[in-house]
């Protein structure tokens, strides 16, 4: 999982990327290709 300050650019890397908010943190998740996972930090 990548940890980035800004997730805006990462969201556009794959069309199935979804932005979700869990426990106050923002994550990018991708079920078909998990290597795109990221967290804002």
Swiss-Prot record:
Keywords: Ribonucleoprotein, Ribosomal protein. The keyword RNA-binding does not apply. One of its GO terms (molecular function) is structural constituent of ribosome. GO terms for cellular component: ribonucleoprotein complex; ribosome. GO terms for biological process: translation. PANTHER family: 50S RIBOSOMAL PROTEIN L36 2 (PTHR47781), LARGE RIBOSOMAL SUBUNIT PROTEIN BL36B (PTHR47781:SF1). Belongs to the bacterial ribosomal protein bL36 family. This is Large ribosomal subunit protein bL36. It comes from Chelativorans sp. (strain BNC1).
